[in-house]
């Protein structure tokens, strides 16, 4: 009977105290830097909020009008009268138009790149989309003022003729297409690359086994997307949409270049005129006196709070959907 000789395995060399202490020191340094970065972010946010609140309180204490409902903006008058009704309306309406146009198109482009386009086409198309996200706002503004506005004059006439009965597209004022509708279209073009890029990456994370299982059961490509890809990426699409909405709410130069500002509220979105928070601040800040700047900062505080509210609502929606998905897993 053959005897077997046990193989002797050398134990792992002991870790020296110096190496162990170096590793622990590195962990402590990294943990400290991470914690410090988080605290720094909170400090920056808090300092911005405190600064805006302090400067806004100075202006609001002397405002003779209702800050939320006054249509006029005359902070240099004696007594000063100013309000954000027109600015809030214009910001919300233009952002809604932008989201209504951009999100469906962005999701369609993202699905095409991730699930339909051949690889030779998907890679350059994704690169072009990412490149569009890096175009400066002022370039979009110049293009919108010199090209988009003249082109939309004909579209406005068509909408007025065939959809004017909806009241929203009833154009009651004569003028070029420097309206909230034009601003919404321009903002949609600007946020389209952001929503597309994030949605595309989310759709690419769908487990391959889920798609293959659905195809093996006889599902068509569209059924796979409808029953597997879209439900999986719903939270990501919401996050992408909120990123786009954040840019639409705070966009300044492009809106200021395209829009004809006026302090009027009209549901006729094709009529020229209107205003947004960012556009009004950019247009008036340099020429305003100290009190006028405080008034503009007060409107900036509202925009700051509006952005926080939108992002908070988006996070709440995403969290609830994740909890619902986990409960039904």
Predicted regions mapped to residue ranges:
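Membrane-cytosol interface at the C-terminal ends of specific transmembrane alpha-helices
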Residues: 107, 112, 167, 172-216, ...
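Membrane-interfacial helix termini and adjacent extracytoplasmic/periplasmic loops
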Residues: 62-85, 140-189, 269-271
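Periplasmic/extracellular loop-to-transmembrane helix junction in inner-membrane transport proteins
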Residues: 14-33, 53-98, 118, 173, ...
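C-terminal transmembrane helix and the adjacent membrane-cytosol boundary/short C-terminal tail
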Residues: 200-204, 208, 215, 283-329
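Transmembrane alpha-helices
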Residues: 128-131, 135, 139, 195-202, ...
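Transmembrane alpha-helical segments of polytopic membrane transport and secretion proteins
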Residues: 1-37, 314-329
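Transmembrane-helix boundary motif in ABC transporter permease subunits
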Residues: 98-129, 314-323
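Glycine-rich helix-loop "coupling/hinge" segments at transmembrane-helix boundaries
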Residues: 245-290
């Amino acid at each position: 009977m053959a005897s077997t000789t046990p193989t002797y395995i050398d134990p792992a060399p002991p870790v020296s105290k110096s190496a162990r202490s170096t590793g622990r020191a590195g962990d402590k340094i990294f943990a400290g830097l991470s914690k410090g970065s988080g605290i720094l972010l909170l400090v920056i946010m808090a300092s911005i909020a405190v600064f805006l609140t302090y400067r806004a309180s100075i202006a609001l204490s002397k405002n003779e009008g209702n800050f939320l409902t006054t249509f006029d903006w005359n902070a240099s008058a004696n007594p000063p009268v100013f309000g954000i009704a027109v600015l809030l309306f214009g910001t919300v309406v233009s952002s809604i138009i932008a989201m209504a146009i951009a999100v469906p198109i962005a999701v369609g482009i993202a699905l095409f790149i991730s699930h339909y386009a051949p690889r030779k086409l998907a890679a350059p198309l994704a690169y072009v989309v990412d490149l569009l996200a890096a175009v400066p706002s002022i370039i979009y503004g110049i293009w919108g003022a010199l090209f988009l506005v003249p082109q939309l004059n004909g579209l406005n006439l068509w909408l007025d003729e065939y959809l004017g009965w909806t009241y929203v597209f009833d154009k009651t004022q004569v003028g070029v297409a420097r309206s909230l509708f034009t601003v919404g279209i321009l903002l949609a073009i600007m946020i389209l690359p952001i929503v597309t890029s994030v949605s595309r990456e989310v759709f690419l994370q769908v487990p391959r086994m889920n798609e293959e299982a659905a195809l093996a059961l006889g599902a068509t490509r569209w059924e796979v997307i409808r029953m597997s890809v879209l439900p999986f990426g719903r939270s990501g699409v919401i996050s992408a949409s909120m990123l786009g909405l954040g840019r639409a709410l705070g966009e300044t130069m492009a809106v200021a270049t395209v829009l004809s500002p006026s302090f009027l509220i009209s549901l006729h979105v094709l009529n020229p005129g209107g205003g947004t928070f960012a556009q009004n601040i950019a247009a008036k800040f340099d020429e305003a006196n100290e009190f006028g700047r405080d008034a503009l900062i007060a409107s900036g505080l509202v925009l700051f709070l509006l952005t926080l509210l939108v992002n908070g609502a988006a996070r709440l929606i995403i969290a609830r959907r994740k909890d619902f998905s986990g409960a039904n897993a």
